[in-house]
Structures are given as C-alpha cells and as structure tokens.
C-alpha cells in the first residue's frame, strides 16, 4: 500500500496545483543583527577527514550526492553566532555531530493557503536523511553565501527559504516574497536518522500564508498534501500508532508538540506578529 493510502483524504500528486490569489502579508520586527561577510569565517572541512570518493557512499543518489558535497552549511554555536562553515555531508555525519558538536543553521517553512490549510510534503526516498517521512512545507539550510548570511530580520534565512521553495516545490519567488515570511522563533535540536546520518540544527521557524502554484521536484519530494488542523491531528495519531509505517520528521514533530497549534490560531486570526519571539532559542 502506498504512503498516500494512509490518508482518508484526496491526495495532491506531483502535478501543478493552481491557486491564484495571494493572501494578506504579515509584518514582523525583532532585534536587528549585523551582517556577516563569508570571507571572515573558517572552513571546518579540514578537520572532518571526509573525502568525496568514499566508496561507502557509492550507492547515494547522484543529485543528493552533489548537494551533500557542494552545499556549504553555516556553522553556529548555541547562541546562533556564526563560527564557520562546512559541507552538508560533514554536517550530517553523526560522528561529527557527536565528536565535534557540529551545529548548523537551518529553517523550516510552514506555508498555509487562504483556507488556513498547511502544506505538507513527504520527503523523497532518495533523501540521505529521513527519506519518506512526512514533514512541514519545506525544511533546509541557508548556505554559506553573502545573501543567506544576512542576519538583520533573518533576511538571509528568508532568502534561503524562497530559494528552496522553488528548488523543492517549484513555487516561484513572486508567489512567496521574502517580506511575507514571518520568522516566529528558533529551536535547537539533535536527531539521528540512522547509524551514520543525523541532524543537529538551530532551526528558524518561518510562517507564510499564500495561495501558490506547486510543482514538486521528484528528486526532493515524493508527495504533497494540504491538511486542516483536525487532519493533522489524525496524521499525528497514525504516526504514533505506527500505522502503515507512517513517520513524521523529528523537527516537525517538535514544532507540532510545542508550538504549532497555538501559532495556527494566530494564522487564522491574522495576528502572527503577536507570536514572534526571536530572542529565545528553544532547546528541545
């Protein structure tokens, strides 16, 4: 039975989802931080000892392999201060996470349509970490580049979110302007995926309400689905019961358990700005 049969709801498959009108934007403000130049910070790759030719990774999907070695994640300390950069590959090796305490900056996008339904994705089966788990709209990393290191009002992270929504879901930049993302908070968590890979992230939680056209990239996304609040609760129950092998990503589950329902209230009321807390880093 396919993963889609786990839902007693219509499934949005990998085709265009045409929705036209845009929704009202949310403004936000929080403590400004200074920008950082990528030239000033160390590259930690010399300390990792990982080679791209590692035969143990010969079976890795070609697209995912390229991203693992080409993408440079932003290394931070537990106060979210940038301390360097390293490859996506090195940042997700559990041996580096445990031995070197490598922590990288990340973001999680929660996109709602004008009916206040949340767009979820099931990660592709070729993903290196957490394949085929269901998660929020888009989860990725700002890269070690000038446009994504801008810290004032989390602009670098918002730029990265716009980039990855196009990469993963085919959502064009015009449909998700960077000014309409509302960063609500940050959380720090660690989660192993298997014996080799895992996550150790300082995750920015970004909310946006827009009606968008979705064209998922099969290299990144297996399926997508909009869910209401009640439908999400049923999904969580199925995951807890282990029905049909359904799994949720650990970061998504942390947000669901700690923040999502109260923030969903603000989505429906149009009061997201009242929920913003970018001073606290929640260690979960």
UniProtKB/Swiss-Prot annotation:
The protein's name: Isopentenyl-diphosphate Delta-isomerase II, chloroplastic
Organism whose genome encodes this protein: Arabidopsis thaliana (Mouse-ear cress)
Record-listed Mg(2+) binding positions: 92, 104, 199, 201
Subcellular location: Plastid, Chloroplast
Lineage: Eukaryota, Viridiplantae, Streptophyta, Embryophyta, Tracheophyta
Modified residues (N-acetylalanine): 46
One function term, GO molecular function aspect: isopentenyl-diphosphate delta-isomerase activity
The EC number(s) this enzyme carries: 5.3.3.2
Cofactor binding note: Binds 1 Mg(2+) ion per subunit.
Keyword Acetylation: yes
Family the entry assigns: Belongs to the IPP isomerase type 1 family.
Gene name of the record: IPP2
Keywords: Acetylation, Chlorophyll biosynthesis, Chloroplast, Isomerase, Isoprene biosynthesis, Magnesium, Metal-binding, Photosynthesis, Plastid, Transit peptide
Binding site for substrate: 88, 123, 127, 140
